[in-house]
């Protein structure tokens, strides 16, 4: 089994949801970002999404857009992001790590080269938000052939006619964007999320992870009762933006991660 399959199987056995945390690689700089990345599993992150900085992150809200600007300004690029994954894997062979971002930097880097180096570095899966299933041959198919999961996003506007096409070829888990719009937007109602989860379960057996707008342990816990995973990104990235020092950024992000993890763990007790 893949690391993602193993992790979700373990959590199903334990009857709890996964805490999926998102941070942008290189934010606010390489060393601080690496310290955060290395600390996330011990702070309670079950799965990590690591953002690949890009100059035009159109699906992201202000917090993550600024994180991209900070990271790029500090010199982060795809080579350094893969180096960061290798450094993380030196001390952690079990926590699933998914790279999330946009196709342009991957295309520029070279798809074949990117897939080979991502696999070698210890990446488990990819989320590429601007690559629809009509372009599976561009990245999804070769990535899966190399052993990388390809995780699709679904939204409230993905209708039943479109949904099977979106889910075809998906692996690892399904990321449900609970509100239409950019990351960090207002949260969807739990009733809406519950209805969406029921609809998705009619189309897939993959674990469902819910994201966008989740900021507090209480909210994370509420969502954890409905799905296999809870994704938190903007709330963590905000802690980096507001920190007065690099040391505080590490401490604040990991502190919030611990609080969120406790909220998720309490959800089904």
UniProtKB/Swiss-Prot annotation:
Keyword Cytoplasm recorded: no
UniProt xrefs under Pfam families: Trp_syntA (PF00290)
GO CC terms, sorted: cytosol
Keyword hit for NAD: no
Catalytic residues (positions): 49, 60
Disulfide cysteine pairs (residue numbers): none
Gene Ontology molecular functions: tryptophan synthase activity
Keywords: Amino-acid biosynthesis, Aromatic amino acid biosynthesis, Lyase, Tryptophan biosynthesis
Reaction(s) catalysed by this chain's protein: (1S,2R)-1-C-(indol-3-yl)glycerol 3-phosphate + L-serine = D-glyceraldehyde 3-phosphate + L-tryptophan + H2O
Catalytic class of the enzyme: lyase
Enzyme Commission code(s) on record: 4.2.1.20
Pathway: Amino-acid biosynthesis; L-tryptophan biosynthesis; L-tryptophan from chorismate: step 5/5
Gene3D superfamilies (UniProt xref): Aldolase class I
Assembly information from the UniProt record: Tetramer of two alpha and two beta chains.
Protein's job: The alpha subunit is responsible for the aldol cleavage of indoleglycerol phosphate to indole and glyceraldehyde 3-phosphate.
Recorded family membership: Belongs to the TrpA family.
HAMAP family in alphabetical order: Trp_synth_alpha
The protein's name: Tryptophan synthase alpha chain
Source organism of this protein record: Azotobacter vinelandii (strain DJ / ATCC BAA-1303)
């Amino acid at each position: 089994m893949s690391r993602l399959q193993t992790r979700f199987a373990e959590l199903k056995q334990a009857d709890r949801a996964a805490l999926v945390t998102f941070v942008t690689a290189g934010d606010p700089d390489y060393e601080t970002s690496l310290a955060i990345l290395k600390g996330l599993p011990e702070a309670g992150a079950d799965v990590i999404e690591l953002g690949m900085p890009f100059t035009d992150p159109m699906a992201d809200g202000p917090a993550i857009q600024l994180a991209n600007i900070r990271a790029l300004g500090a010199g982060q690029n795809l080579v350094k992001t893969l180096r960061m994954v290798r450094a993380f894997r030196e001390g952690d062979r079990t926590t699933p790590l998914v790279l999330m971002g946009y196709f342009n930097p991957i295309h520029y880097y070279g798809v074949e080269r990117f897939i080979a180096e991502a696999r070698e570095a210890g990446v488990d899966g990819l989320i590429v938000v601007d690559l629809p299933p009509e372009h599976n041959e561009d990245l999804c198919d070769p990535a899966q052939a190399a052993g990388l999961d390809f995780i699709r996003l679904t939204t409230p506007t993905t209708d039943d006619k479109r949904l099977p096409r979106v889910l075809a070829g998906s692996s690892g888990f399904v990321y449900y964007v609970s509100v239409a719009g950019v990351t960090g937007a207002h949260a969807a109602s739990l009733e809406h999320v519950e209805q969406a989860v029921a609809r998705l379960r009619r189309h897939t057996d993959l674990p469902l992870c819910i994201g966008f707008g989740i900021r507090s342990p209480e909210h994370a816990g509420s969502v954890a009762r409905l799905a296999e995973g809870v994704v938190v990104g903007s709330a963590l990235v905000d802690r980096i933006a507001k920190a007065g020092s690099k040391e505080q950024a590490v401490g604040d992000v990991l502190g919030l991660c611990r609080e969120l993890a406790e909220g998720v763990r309490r959800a089904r007790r």
